[in-house]
């Protein structure tokens, strides 16, 4: 089919053949589905820059969230290490004071 103008005579010719009524319905169904495919393709082409920008924003937000979580985790680890050192220093000073009293 080179043009849309050939479709109408073809459809009329197919309708005149009574034995092929199912074939006409199938042909019309295929044409409608092809038309919807073309329309959806055009809509996707027009809207794709907007969806790409939103995906990029979502990805940047996810990266920032992960970065914040890693920073919080490292701060928590540093706090635990510092707390462990203070407890260790306290235990060490107690041990030294007990030794002085014992001798």
Curated annotation (Swiss-Prot):
Subcellular location, principal: mitochondrion
GO cellular component: mitochondrion
GO biological process: extrinsic apoptotic signaling pathway; positive regulation of cold-induced thermogenesis; positive regulation of extrinsic apoptotic signaling pathway
Compartments where located: Mitochondrion
InterPro entries per record: G0S2
Annotated keywords: Apoptosis, Cell cycle, Mitochondrion
Keyword Plastid: no
Listed Pfam families: G0-G1_switch_2
Tagged with keyword Metal-binding: no
Role: Promotes apoptosis by binding to BCL2, hence preventing the formation of protective BCL2-BAX heterodimers.
Quaternary state and interactors: Directly interacts with BCL2; this interaction prevents the formation of the anti-apoptotic BAX-BCL2 complex.
Protein's recorded name: G0/G1 switch protein 2
Organism encoding this protein: Rattus norvegicus (Rat)
